[in-house]
Amino acid sequence: MKSGLLFTTASLALTASAHYVFPALVQDGAATGDWKYVRDWTGSYGNGPVEDVTSLDIRCNKDASTNGNATETLPVKAGEEIGFTVRTNIGHPGPLLAYMAKAPGDASDFDGDGQVWFKIYEDGPTVTDDGLTWPSDGATNVNFTIPSSLPDGDYLLRVEHIALHGAGTEGGAQFYLSCGQVSVTGGGNGDPAPLVAFPGAYDPTDPGILINIYWPVPTNYTPPGPKVWSG
């Protein structure tokens, strides 16, 4: 009995230690303060994932869609590289994605509701006969480029990593995500598309969400959601 309890405790600790969160924006290679420009969410201290793609939590995480007034907005330039820190590191296999949504006014007043989100980044695995290798595996920060033709204004910047280690059963994928607030200048007249809503962009049975990544080894993988708008 004792050895079984020790095994269970160790397994739970290992699972928890693999969880992660995106607490801060990165600009010019330097991390900003945790939850200064990124909306904090209920339970963020536990680094836990969202598992229901039909819930409001899939937008900016738990209770984060409506707490923008507690968050500052970071000035950025179109074409600039912006990132997020990872606490402590990306500990599960899966794709990394980034979305933006234009606020009608101040980002702090914007809840991100409706078909307003467009994808600016995604990565995928290297596929071999031996399995899938993910470029974000173990990352302690992640970076994306703000599209150069993006119109000026305030935006929500949503980072998301989808952990697929348990995705062989419906509801087994884990979504680690945060939303930052940025104000873009120096942009252009681009028309970001396609636009999607969160919740709504994903279905629990999408092939990029419901998938066994271990056996049989997939021959290809496409992340869920719309195509990337590069501007």
Curated annotation (Swiss-Prot):
Protein name per Swiss-Prot or TrEMBL: AA9 family lytic polysaccharide monooxygenase C
Source species of the chain: Emericella nidulans (strain FGSC A4 / ATCC 38163 / CBS 112.46 / NRRL 194 / M139) (Aspergillus nidulans)
This enzyme's EC code(s): 1.14.99.56
Family: Belongs to the polysaccharide monooxygenase AA9 family.
GO terms of biological process kind: cellulose catabolic process
Cofactor(s) this protein requires: Cu(2+)
Record's keyword terms, sorted: Carbohydrate metabolism, Cellulose degradation, Copper, Disulfide bond, Glycoprotein, Metal-binding, Monooxygenase, Oxidoreductase, Polysaccharide degradation, Secreted, Signal
Signal peptide extent: 1-18
GO cellular component: extracellular region
Binding, Cu(2+): 19, 176
Cofactor note text: Binds 1 copper ion per subunit.
Record-listed O2 binding positions: 165, 174
Example GO molecular function: monooxygenase activity
Disulfide bonds listed in the record: 60-179
